[in-house]
């Protein structure tokens, strides 16, 4: 049960967790109301391959024999921002290019789950996909989902074929951005007060940290969308509907993200321990593609590029997202914006296909060499 926490000197602000739980419920109810107006999700057909505590592994129907993808959404909101509507869906774009698309859906995650458990869940899903398609999947992650995917690639280097990071924060310190003041204003371990941190509380914190992006920007996008035409107007409200799908995070995860990553930058320093082993960017030895927004205050480009530069990747692809009308939050634009689907995702998906061609060629040459030795 969430209780009002009395204010204690140097112990952070008093927070009524029960109030924010009720606010989460009200926001989800508002989202259901928008569904009745035709503004709800219209996901591509998929089936659940596996379900366990906190997660589901989905495989989307269609596609072909192309690259195997494992999408790792941010656990903060619903997974279907990757498949918001047919005209603005990374999932459908990948299926149309023959990819085998899988997605890790975060469910009611146990309160005991921290970074170790979330990263392990990504690794298990990657292993399950590999067992199904007989090849390592490419991990794709947005925001905190990308952070978890990168940590998985560092801790479990044999599980991923490559990484695709979409505005995923990984380097902090001077690259923390607008969230730095918020994190530094709270005492270490603050989020451990909660078994689960309500999604609306996280949203309020983000809005206070960067009102230009999470408040003013949404209103300005609504106005621009109305002037831009019905397509942009509708997509704006589809994105707003998605923001109402509140998902609480375990207090343990939030505390570890705030303290170990944002406050202490342990991953970049090589002092982050995952499941008993220290990890660092140099442990990531797979190709990395990254989409950054040079305008972003929430995930500054340096928070992503700093990691890419420090990783031991044999190949990299760095793309810049410049913004769109009709995305509500520009932080979502790289997933749902017109320019992203016109300019960025075709390049990313072709890059993945080229990686697979190169990998298949190397495997064929290796098999031929082994066969030749056997014949001799």
What is each model feature region?
Residues 109-112, 120-137:
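Conserved acidic catalytic loop of the alpha/beta-hydrolase fold
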Residues 294-299:
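Acidic catalytic loop of the alpha/beta-hydrolase fold
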Residues 317-376:
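Catalytic active-site module of serine/aspartate enzymes centered on a nucleophile-bearing elbow/loop
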Residues 44, 48-107:
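Short, surface-exposed "cap/lid" segments of acyl-processing enzymes
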Residues 1-11, 135, 148-252:
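Alpha/beta-hydrolase-fold enzymes
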Residues 140-141, 145, 149:
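Gly/Ala-rich beta-loop-alpha elbow adjacent to hydrolase catalytic centers
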Residues 284, 290-292:
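Short beta-strand/loop motif that positions the catalytic acidic residue
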């Amino acid at each position: 049960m969430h209780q009002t926490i009395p204010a204690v000197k140097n112990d952070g602000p008093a927070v009524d967790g029960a109030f924010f739980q009720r606010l989460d419920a009200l926001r989800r109810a508002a989202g259901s109301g928008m569904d009745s107006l035709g503004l709800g999700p219209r996901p591509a057909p998929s089936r659940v391959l596996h379900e366990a505590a906190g997660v589901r592994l989905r495989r989307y129907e269609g596609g072909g024999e192309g690259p195997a993808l494992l999408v790792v959404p941010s656990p903060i909101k619903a997974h279907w921002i990757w498949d918001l509507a047919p005209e603005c869906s990374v999932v459908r774009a990948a299926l149309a290019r023959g990819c085998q698309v899988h997605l890790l859906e975060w469910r009611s995650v146990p309160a005991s789950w921290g970074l170790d458990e979330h990263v392990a869940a990504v690794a298990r899903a990657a292993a399950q996909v590999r067992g199904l398609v007989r090849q390592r999947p490419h991990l794709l992650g947005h925001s905190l989902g990308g952070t978890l995917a990168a940590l998985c690639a560092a801790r479990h280097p044999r599980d991923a074929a490559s990484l695709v990071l979409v505005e995923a924060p990984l380097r902090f310190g001077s690259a923390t951005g607008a969230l730095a003041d918020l994190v530094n204003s709270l005492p270490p371990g603050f989020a451990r007060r909660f078994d689960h941190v309500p999604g609306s509380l996280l949203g309020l914190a983000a809005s206070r940290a960067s009102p230009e992006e999470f408040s003013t920007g949404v209103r300005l996008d609504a106005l621009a969308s109305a002037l831009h035409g019905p397509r942009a107007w509708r997509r704006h409200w589809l994105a707003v509907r998605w923001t109402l799908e509140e998902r609480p995070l375990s207090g343990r995860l939030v505390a570890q993200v705030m303290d170990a990553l944002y406050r202490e930058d342990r991953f970049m320093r090589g002092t982050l321990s995952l499941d008993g082993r220290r990890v660092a960017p140099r442990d990531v030895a797979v190709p990395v593609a990254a989409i950054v927004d040079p305008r972003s205050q929430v995930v500054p480009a340096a928070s992503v590029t700093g990691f890419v530069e420090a990783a031991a990747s044999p190949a990299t692809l760095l793309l810049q997202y410049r913004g769109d009308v009709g995305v509500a939050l520009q932080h979502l634009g790289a997933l749902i914006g017109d320019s992203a689907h016109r300019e960025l995702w075709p390049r990313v998906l072709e890059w993945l296909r080229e990686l697979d061609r190169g990998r298949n060629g190397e495997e064929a040459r290796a098999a031929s060499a082994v066969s030749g030795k056997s014949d001799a």
